[in-house]
Amino acid sequence: MKTKSRYTTLAASLLVALPLGLGSVASAQAETMITAVMQAPLRSLDPVITTAYVIRNYGYMIYDTLLSVDADGNIQPQMLEKWEVSDDGKTYTFTLRDGLKWHDGGDVTSADCIASIDRWATQDKMGQIMKELTTATDRIDDKTFSMTFSTATNIALRALSKPSSLAAFIMPERVARTSPAEPITEAIGSGPFKFVMEEFKPGVNALFVKNDEYVPRSEPASGMAGARIVKVDKVRWVSMPDAMTGVNAIKNGEIDFIEQAPYDLLPLLESDSNIQLIVSTLQGGQPVMRLNHLQPPFDNKLVRQAALAAIDQGEIMQANIGDAKYFRTCAALFGCDTRYGTDAGAGDLVKADAAKSKALLKEAGYDGTPVVIMHPTDFANAGGSFVPVIAQELRQGGFTVRVDAMDWQTLVTRRASQKPIAEGGWNIFTTYLSLADISDPLANYAAASNGTGAWFGWPEQARVEELRQNFATTDDDARLTALATEVQELVMDNVGVVPLGEFAVVGAARASLKGILDAPVPVFWNIEKTGK
């Protein structure tokens, strides 16, 4: 077994990472194929309509973005040749680079970019702030467009370059004109891979082939930026819901890659010289519990605060991960050891206080109505391994609890429902947020508090939205820190989201996959497969 890691414990810092990207500069042999088991099966083809990471990963296979972030955190052009900023800091002019082609042969144009940004910005929480600040978006010519804002801001660069959900993927204009409420079904991008629709079996199999017409950038690959050079002919994603089946398959050479290896089975992989383990904190993240603010009983703030008081992060993380070197408790909404990491307002977040939970429920007049928790049994890190612990902690805190078991895709669909429980609604769901998605009040979509326009759960706090917009229009470090701290205090008081700790992902790959890219997303460009 070969292990690649920049640290031995999470205490070294969850901000430093060696992500699970795959890369190499060697040439691929004919008809090479990587067979991969991703964190969850691919069922949807719309990376704008949901924050589910497997669909984000799919997006990076076939689409491209205007901007990217390199391994040092710097914003770099990707589809762009350049951008320019007006003297007053309000207008950004973007120019596309040469050689951008859709998979069906057409040229990528500024009209495609404008339509794609518009659809994405209605869904993405940072995009929503950007849209509120935008006064004009103008097509200048087929390769050039501009965005003008009501005040000086760098939110366009930040929003269009952010690597994780929702990434601002550029689509053909005809596709991007689809209502955000209607999932797209086409799979035509301009990225380094093409999607083979004829092979697609939702939840079972997805096939990508090298896009021979793709023109990569000339700069070396770095993080999500630089050249996206495909060195294999095909990548196939397959579903293996049983963890032991996946481990046996990679040991036997039947598959090449597991995005998230099961922690309890790592000893079986560590002892195999044909397997490399890749420890990633940037692709790991923060498990969260999300409460439905629209439906009883969590439409009552006291009941939400009771739920927070009942939670014990240590018990939950132990159930989820097990090995303490891969997790830690953390009371920071924006991540521990990050620029805006703080425990301000966290109160009872880390340790349970069942007596306080019961007292709050009594004060709220809670009548014992069952709280319905959705349990994604096929996705450990999103709750499959720890929802039973949450249920027990809530019961100890005085709640009546009903656990509804389901697969991850069913949860992703059901969590969009704002209906009462009797009509298929819900009270609690769990998932995890990548550290790339939680670093500040703009990136952290769970902090958004614009009611029914917010992420699933729909908290509403006008002051939080005011602070988030202020965060987008200042560059004073002290002011930014003060804004982030106040956002955390307000969100935690309102129980907009309940962070449950932090963990590192451990991925597994055959030793024949050479080269590792530092990236917050598992990528398949720049990879060399040298054998079985």
Go through each PLM region and give its residues.
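N-terminal lobe/hinge region of extracytoplasmic solute-binding protein
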Residues: 37-87, 115-118, 188, 499
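Ligand/substrate-recognition segments at binding pockets and active sites
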Residues: 202-204, 243, 261, 327, ...
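Surface-exposed binding/hinge segments that line
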Residues: 29, 95, 129-201
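Gly/Pro-rich hinge or "lid" segments in bacterial periplasmic/extracellular proteins
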Residues: 164-236, 244-245, 355, 359
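Periplasmic-binding protein-like
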Residues: 294, 298-338, 382-386, 491-499
